[in-house]
């Protein structure tokens, strides 16, 4: 399985199934919506990793951020461009088919924010340190990683469990941990299992 999930065809095959993938909410993730509305945020450029159809990227754009959503699955990007991008009229939303592990080669230090939601748990566990390094590399000095880590407590994956101690072990060498706590705003099936994160690049 770990080798298979490193290939875009694996993720495209899931999008081709009759039912939508379970990670497609049809709206922005409620913890993100709360964060965007709860206080005035400094605007900037945000990378939305594993963006799917782009609902979270759309939420950022609608709040004035310049949002670039990246996804490995071509079908996810195609559907997002058809269904979600037309909902935004401000010119601040872009969806790109890409392997986010390759972003440091072209996007080093170009983002004020990185947004994480379901990507960390989709990555093979042996690549988690590489994932954290990628997030660090594409952020500007003092840039912030925000989002949720899915601590579901089950064996196997994807999604692979994101235990709090594992998240801290991977990210704390590269980021100052401002917040990592259970979100009070998760959808029903994830209540109590999503850790809201706010990390600042060291």
Question: PLM ranges: what are they?
Answer:
Residues 112:
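Conserved acidic residues
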Residues 2-48, 53-107, 123-202:
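Class I (Rossmann-like) S-adenosyl-L-methionine-dependent methyltransferase catalytic domain
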Residues 115:
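A conserved beta-strand element that flanks and buttresses the S-adenosyl-L-methionine
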Residues 118, 122:
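Short catalytic micro-motifs in class I SAM-dependent methyltransferases
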């Amino acid at each position: 399985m770990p080798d298979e999930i490193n290939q875009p065809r694996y993720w495209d095959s899931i999008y081709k199934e009759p039912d939508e993938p379970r990670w497609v909410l049809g709206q922005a993730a409620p913890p993100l919506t709360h964060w965007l509305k709860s206080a005035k945020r400094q605007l900037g450029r945000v990378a939305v990793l594993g963006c799917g159809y782009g609902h979270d990227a759309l939420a950022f754009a609608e709040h004035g951020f310049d949002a670039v959503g990246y996804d490995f699955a071509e079908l996810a990007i195609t559907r997002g461009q058809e269904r979600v991008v037309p909902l935004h009229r401000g010119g601040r939303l872009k969806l790109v088919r890409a392997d986010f592990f390759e972003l440091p080669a072209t996007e080093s230090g170009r983002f004020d924010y990185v947004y994480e939601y379901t990507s960390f748990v989709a990555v093979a566990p042996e690549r988690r340190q590489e994932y954290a390094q990628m997030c660090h590399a594409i952020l500007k000095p003092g840039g912030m990683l925000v989002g949720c880590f899915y601590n579901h407590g089950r064996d196997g994956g994807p999604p692979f469990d994101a235990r709090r101690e594992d998240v801290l072990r991977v990210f704390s060498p590269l980021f100052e941990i401002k917040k990592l706590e259970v979100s009070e705003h998760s959808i029903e099936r994830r209540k109590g299992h999503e850790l809201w994160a706010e990390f600042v690049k060291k």
